[in-house]
Amino acid sequence: MLSAALLLLPGLPLAGAGATEEPTQESGPLGEPPPGLALFRWQWHEVEAPYLVALWILVASLAKIVFHLSRKVTSLVPESCLLILLGLVLGGIVLAVAKKAEYQLEPGTFFLFLLPPIVLDSGYFMPSRLFFDNLGAILTYAVVGTLWNAFTTGVALWGLQQAGLVAPRVQAGLLDFLLFGSLISAVDPVAVLAVFEEVHVNQTLFIIIFGESLLNDAVTVVLYKVCNSFVEMGSANVQATDYLKGVASLFVVSLGGAAVGLVFAFLLALTTRFTKRVRIIEPLLVFLLAYAAYLTAEMASLSAILAVTMCGLGCKKYVEANISHKSRTAVKYTMKTLASCAETVIFMLLGISAVDSSKWAWDSGLVLGTLFFILFFRALGVVLQTWALNQFRLVPLDKIDQVVMSYGGLRGAVAFALVILLDRTKVPAKDYFVATTIVVVFFTVIVQGLTIKPLVKWLRVKRSDYHKPTLNQELHEHTFDHILAAVEDVVGHHGYHYWRDRWEQFDKKYLSQLLMRRSAYRIRDQIWDVYYRLNIRDAISFVDQGGHVLSSTGLTLPSMPSRNSVAETSVTNLLRESGSGACLDLQVIDTVRSGRDREDAVMHHLLCGGLYKPRRRYKASCGRHFISEDAQERQDKEIFQQNMKRRLESFKSTKHNICFTKSKPRPRKTSHKKKDGVANPEATNGKPPRDLGFQDTAAVILTVESEEEEESDSSETEKEDDEGIIFVARATSEVLQEGKVSGSLEVCPSPRIIPPSPTCAEKELPWKSGQGDLAVYVSSETTKIVPVDMQTGWNQSISSLESLASPPCTQPPTLTRLPPHPLVTEEPQVPIDLSSDPRSSFAFPPSLAKAGRSRSESSADIPQQELQPLMGHKDHTHLSPGTANSHWCIQFNRGGRL
């Protein structure tokens, strides 16, 4: 767009370049043949216009690079000042060589091509919440302030002429000075943006000044057109209805421009909703429709700046949610590049245009009077308007803010382009107005731009400390918004918070569902996004710590705006796409067919696994037990399970079941000896081994540390408290070892319980008996967190595990003797009667209890009640209390089919 825009640069023979006469072949004398084929031909006129445009942009870019080579220069002098000075130098060189000014800033080039990218960039990336929070102050300064500055400056200059302080050769009346006051009083958005972005004042002050420079365009356009029409008509022909039409045109131009921008914003958001399969055209649609809004408003004589500002401000929320991450990046950098190039060309052409002395005439009284009046009336208007606004603002604007606002009223290329558009036949003093405008622009951009940063430092103005708000800040901000809206609703006052709350409800109910893609609308909740990220991180940690080939780099954690839906980036899908063998939910993958059902299933499992179920509320009753037994039991079980998870989170799990201390870890020597009593699955009945599932080939290990190790790693545990429970899947042969590992690494072996009796399936299917040991290491320290009153719930949980296996055989079970543990003294085994309590889940042999007493005599005072909930009702007498701080290996022989 910028390249096409600069094709209309003044001084370039663009029309002539396109319409150059084709060379005619001059024939020689009669009968002579035409000249032969030329090997080389210079065709400068065919490429002159685009070549010069490319050269200007290249020179401007190289100049910016040179300026930023010295950090000291750019920290003291604004970039806009350096570009204007560069334009003056280049204009002087061109004037000295060509003896005339070749290049100038034409109004058509400026308004149609150079200004739109700057305004679009400002409106699209404007903080909408901050803008609408200060909308009242912005409109006050933009409308009332601009009207005040225009009329007071024009009347004061007319009075100055009547007093004889302006030369008589300046032939201008009251309408002429009002016309000049309307174009010179508007704050320029390009100059404000160029200067204040380098000063870094606080966001409230910046949004008020910059918002004023954007919204005062409607007032400037109306005043300029009305005064220009009055000048062309003549003061004698102006009637009362013309004044009324001028007032009405203010509302038509401003509201019409805003309406045009909102219509194109709606079309842009609606169009990007259906670009999921053609992502490549998304950036093109953004620029085309925004530029179409500007041209439409300009065509209808409405405020084009206001139209493109409202278009960018209104469509960003929906467009950012619909387009892809790459498209957002392309839109951002393309828009910034176009705005930077246009701003650079504008300031350079301002400097070049000032060299041409044939288009301006000098009058000291007019120039000095204009400088004084625009500064004085600007400061007076800011003080009066701020006093009125502070009567209603919760956070008033202090005197320091008023000084910066008064000093920050910069004028720029908008005023220069408007004064160039004046008709010299209708306005005889045009040359004097042009010279005065150039001086005012140079003074505000160079002098005020150079001194505003030291002024801000001297006044100690609050600087901007922009940072991404945390989740806590966002929660409190939303809470305060709802509270203030509720207070206004209660007292019956429909204020700002009430209407903002109503707008948010309307947007959520209608606009977002219409203009945003369904997947984008469902995932835009920031609180849910945080929960989603935490679950993804836990899943990555689970896969990484579980010993699988997949590492944490194999799972990419997408950002919130970049993913299309939760189902597309769920943990299960990430594992499947990366070729992982781990599957978090097999049933979801096997049964779900539609994307919506898959998304709901994944979210259901995530919420059920990480959140408490809602507590039931019961009405008060006169009875002692008014809660039903089933509900109370279910809630107690859930609380117990959640407490178990939290306690286990404080323990550090490792990949090889090793207890780390502060000393440097050393590699552990694994034992390759086979356990006695375990059948070899490779030669069962002379058949090849079958394809075993993960429950038949590996054991699930829960690594739990002792109290000493927990204290030594307390600092590391606090840093990793949000990683969740980590399950380490390893082969059983790697778990059992023969002795201690050298150094501070130690494997804590534990005795095993007697396996349950073989089932009918194992009797009928011989290969079922070769499953191996499936052991679960659980520290007896965890039994301390089991309350005594939860014994029934624990036994029911153990019974539910047994119920998953095949039905037991009707024949009486044959009890086998356990082989002696490598680290436990072998003693004669005593058979244990399991028929007394069929619900008992496990039992400890007396020999192991005696071994426990021999190892830890000092802990004999620990009460037996601590281990009671983990045992059956009839097995308490076989346990020694001296084993409370030991590690136990509890083996559950699961069935071959679940």
Swiss-Prot record:
Disruption phenotype: Deficient mice are born at normal Mendelian ratios without gross abnormalities in postnatal development. However, deficient mice display significant enhancement of learning and memory accompanied by an increase in the number of hippocampal excitatory synapses in the hippocampus. Phosphorylated by PRKAA2; promotes its accumulation at the cell surface. Phosphorylated by CSNK2A1 in a manner favoring its beta-arrestin binding and endocytosis. Signal peptide: none annotated. Highest expression level is detected in brain. Expressed in hippocampal neurons (at protein level). Gene3D superfamilies: 6.10.140.1330. Plasma membrane Na(+)/H(+) antiporter. Mediates the electroneutral exchange of intracellular H(+) ions for extracellular Na(+) in 1:1 stoichiometry. Responsible for regulating intracellular pH homeostasis, in particular in neural tissues. Acts as a negative regulator of dendritic spine growth. Plays a role in postsynaptic remodeling and signaling. Can also contribute to organellar pH regulation, with consequences for receptor tyrosine kinase trafficking. This is Sodium/hydrogen exchanger 5.
